Amino acid sequence: MVISLRFTSYRTTIRLKSCHDEPNKFCNFAAKITFMRIARFTFNPFSENTYLLYDESMECVIIDPGMTDEDEDSILFGFIRDEKLRPVKVLNTHCHIDHILGNASSCNTFDIKLYAHEKELQMLERAGAASLMWNVPYRESPLPHHYIQEGEQIHFGNTVLDVLFTPGHAPGHVVFVQHQEKVILGGDVLFKGSVGRVDLPGCNATDLVSSIQHKLYTLADDYVVYPGHGPETTIGDEKKHNAFVRSDWSGL
């Protein structure tokens, strides 16, 4: 099993707060240096990407924890402790077995809650059977503390993630978008040169195409997609080159 770490540091943004200009008076400026960082870990036999997002507050969210055992736990948790981060939420883009294997250990270790879409509850409740079918160890996930919805905002530290409802690969699939940094945590909707599977229970090819064309492809070309499997890509590259869903036809 290959476990890899990818660390991306985004540009630094300077936010200025100024007083109103007044004649013959100096205007005071308060500058705040902010950043958002993404750490990517690849876990489990499915080579699933688990993401850790954090900013200068040192608060972080864990997205789709895929750790199967204590050895994989120690890689993610060791990074969190070494960086002195404070996890505040676990977020699931969807609840297929490869994306939830580390839900329990993450929530229990850091005493934090799970956030997912309500339409993924049935999948989460059937995860034990899925683990037997795929022959992977499973530590029972807690149920969601909060059901995520389209248009909602997820807050941690000084960072805001916008939620887009993107069904197709899973009935309650969502993606998380950070507009300031033009980043999409995309789960299994859109990959580099490919798209999420539509041959699993609850999948719908028409919905997947609609999610990509009407939710993701409407974002600017320079938005970076961090998918649930494989390398990152950009919206512009996929609109031009993805043979499964182009921006000007139905695909699939």
How would you name each of these model-derived features?
Residues 8, 12-13, 30-34:
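Ala/Thr-enriched low-complexity intrinsically disordered regions
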Residues 36-83, 175-186:
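Conserved beta-strand hairpin/beta-sheet module of binuclear metal-dependent hydrolase folds
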Residues 61, 91, 114, 184-185, ...:
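Residue-level marker for buried hydrophobic side chains located in beta-strands
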Residues 67-73, 77-156, 240-248:
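Active-site HxH/HxHxD metal-binding segment of metal-dependent hydrolases
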Residues 67-68, 130, 159-252:
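Metallo-beta-lactamase
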